Amino acid sequence: MSLYLKAEKIQSWRVLIMACAGFIFNTTEFVPVAMLSDIAQSFDMQTADTGLMMTVYAWTVLIMSLPAMLATGNMERKSLLIKLFIIFIVGHILLVIAWNFWILLLARMCIALAHSVFWSITASLVMRISPKHKKTQALGMLAIGTALATILGLPIGRIVGQLVGWRVTFGIIAVLALSIMFLIIRLLPNLPSKNAGSIASLPLLAKRPLLLWLYVTTAIVISAHFTAYTYIEPFMIDVGHLDPNFATAVLLVFGFSGIAASLLFNRLYRFAPTKFIVVSMSLLMFSLLLLLFSTEAIIAMFSLVFIWGIGISCIGLSLQMRVLKLAPDATDVATAIYSGIFNAGIGAGALFGNLATTYLGLNEIGYTGAALGLIGFIIFITTHLKYRHTFLLQNNKKITAL
């Protein structure tokens, strides 16, 4: 094997490790969705109230993403990753022993702190450590890792939770995180901070209208998705009258749709980025609008959830790629803001879902999400039409507004 091929193989393994890290972080963020009923029962709470643990997690990421990124902006990236995993593991140990819901929320906030920095640096890191001609594929690999969190993480987490308790699920995640941390120590090179940006980058980013409106669109569209997705488990059981095993299968289908979305993104996004986003948003709205009707037949729900998963996964990938394109001079800061806003959308969606469930009924979460999705869709189309011919100047380079 030539030195070039050997180096490329090592780089590919490094990307795979980061994809596994993404899998772990996404699994722990969303696995409560599959165990809300069990967690609520443990603390003698209403399921809708337990869903607020998603809100607290997401809003911790929102609040901490930018300040934490600025505080760690000059740190060598490998050592930073190791520190993040230590915080992540300690948070999960606290989750396992949580003796009341408030301790559980404290543990989730600890994990969210690690999350806020991890997702601020991961996309740009993956592109740095990947083979030169496989940058887009590397981002796609990271996306597959996050998609596997819903394919394997959520269903397996639910199964483990049902068999031996939700605490064991979080304990297993801690063990997996420890294994990945050792792989990072062993295989990742030292990675000095590069194009991370600083507090001085904020005024420059604030002068890029396409980027600012992209953040607004992200917050609203992600809120639309999580308005329904946060409560999909009780929706399927209480409204759809599905057996809990079928509910697990639906989550599995949602996860597989993420892999399909990653493949579509790798093949199609570069040819027509804006059309790709528009179609993806349309799929999301269509799915949420028809969510209640899909409960009439099992096959309808499986089909709709698959389409829904493709839509939201493509949205997440394409919006993140656009952020990187619009802020190549401050990738980590711009991504930190994106990550914070993305999680604000998760928290707001969980809250909207809670309000819809409480005041309108669980069967209305799809309509509520679709209404929010329409608002985000209109904002995206309007701002694209207004700014599609603009150019952003940074470091004497023209950055085409895609």
From Swiss-Prot:
Keywords linked to the UniProt accession: Cell inner membrane, Cell membrane, Membrane, Sugar transport, Transmembrane, Transmembrane helix, Transport
TM helices/strands, residue ranges: 15-35, 51-71, 84-104, 109-129, 137-157, 168-188, 209-229, 245-265, 276-296, 297-317, 333-353, 365-385
InterPro entries (UniProt xref): MFS, MFS_dom, MFS_Efflux_Transporters, MFS_trans_sf, Sugar_effux_transptr_put
UniProt entry tagged with the keyword Transmembrane helix: yes
Any single Gene Ontology cellular-component annotation: plasma membrane
Annotated localization: Cell inner membrane
Origin superkingdom: Bacteria
A single GO molecular function term of this UniProt record: carbohydrate transmembrane transporter activity
PROSITE patterns membership: MFS
NCBIfam families, sorted: PRK03545.1 (NF002921)
Protein name: Probable sugar efflux transporter
Species of provenance: Haemophilus influenzae (strain 86-028NP)
